[in-house]
Amino acid sequence: MLPLLLCIVPYCWSSRLDPRASSFDYNGEKVRGVNLGGWLVLEPWITPSIFDAAGAEAVDEWSLTKILGKEEAEARLSAHWKSFVSAGDFQRMADAGLNHVRIPIGYWALGPLEGDPYVDGQLEYLDKAVEWAGAAGLKVLIDLHGAPGSQNGFDNSGRRGAIQWQQGDTVEQTLDAFDLLAERYLGSDTVAAIEAINEPNIPGGVDQGKLQEYYGSVYGIVNKYNAGTSVVYGDGFLPVESWNGFKTEGSKVVMDTHHYHMFDNGLIAMDIDSHIDAVCQFAHQHLEASDKPVIVGEWTGAVTDCAKYLNGKGNGARYDGSYAADKAIGDCSSLATGFVSKLSDEERSDMRRFIEAQLDAFELKSGWVFWTWKTEGAPGWDMSDLLEAGVFPTSPDDREFPKQC
């Protein structure tokens, strides 16, 4: 069991509340949001400097904190949490016409388990984020991004490698963490939704039946603390419409699907016209076929996997043939680091066109949450950079390439 946490910042929300209507209508309004990736859950490709400073064996937050030790890890991560995001970022999001921010958090923020090398302290900053978002008029979707044992084997779960979630007590431990998260935050009108777990990997071995049981338990926890909060379920890398008929009652369940074009050998080889056709087809075939609201909770402007460490620290890229034994499609030298200002005019125009197509496609259903707000330099992935460069529309309705879907 995880220890009970009390409020430690200037405000505190009641854990027992009268039911309220959702503070956002996911059936009627369009979600227009961005993720705060790489902040409270680290990813090597978003902040490579943190991982490079710890040596070659630091490939995820687990190994990073294990190598550094508790004291040094607390010092370095606290400095990162304090400096990476500020209140001004949330105002910039609002000024760009966004209405949501999705904030990943790991189970260890609620209290690391015995034997974990992780450090906690993230909740102080999540509290600040909710406050800043509310002041800017944004809604928050809190996302449980990492579960004990790893639900997908990706470094963004905290620990890459084997999928061990659903083994031993890991599901019960996850529910303990989720309960504490819900108790702490679901009293805030700013927190419109909470996500049960990020990217549970059914093709990779997560049992769908047990996942559905977990989703049911999460639904009960949310009802316990605030029946008006929407519950977000990841599609588990299955077609989102395959979840039709599951938890369709009422209007509080929202499905989350993630759509990327660089982790598939067929998609990554496409030209820009084919990328746009594919994203429009995805929306018509899958999003519009769902019986529940669906947000595309992760997507981006990049069409290659060239960003440094995107496939994991120490791994290469499909695009230039350095990942596994894939055939090279192109050159990653201008796409691995840096910002979109160094791209050619044609590359920036194609990226804007692709972004606009995705905005159109995803708003055929319930909307979108871009991945991610900020990086140390990953062209196409950094919304703050894309906005500044005019590659992402400065208002979500602005179009240089209208009606692509």
UniProtKB/Swiss-Prot annotation:
Belongs to the glycosyl hydrolase 5 (cellulase A) family. This is Glucan 1,3-beta-glucosidase A. Induction: The combination of poor nutrition conditions and attachment of mycelia to a hydrophobic solid surface appears to be a major inducing factor. The active site is at E199, E298. GO terms for molecular function: glucan exo-1,3-beta-glucosidase activity; metal ion binding. It catalyses: Successive hydrolysis of beta-D-glucose units from the non-reducing ends of (1->3)-beta-D-glucans, releasing alpha-glucose. Its cofactor is Mn(2+). Pfam families: Cellulase (PF00150). It is found in: Secreted. Keywords: Carbohydrate metabolism, Cell wall biogenesis/degradation, Disulfide bond, Glycosidase, Hydrolase, Manganese, Metal-binding, Polysaccharide degradation, Secreted, Signal. Monomer. One of its GO terms (biological process) is cell wall organization. It comes from the Eukaryota. Its EC number is 3.2.1.58. Its main location: secreted. Disulfide bonds join C280-C405, C306-C332. Gene3D superfamilies: Glycosidases. The lineage of its organism: Eukaryota, Fungi, Dikarya, Ascomycota, Pezizomycotina. InterPro entries: Glyco_hydro_5, Glycoside_hydrolase_SF, Glycosyl_hydrolase_5. Beta-glucanases participate in the metabolism of beta-glucan, the main structural component of the cell wall. It could also function biosynthetically as a transglycosylase. Residues 1-14 form the signal peptide. GO terms for cellular component: cell surface; extracellular region. The keyword Manganese applies.
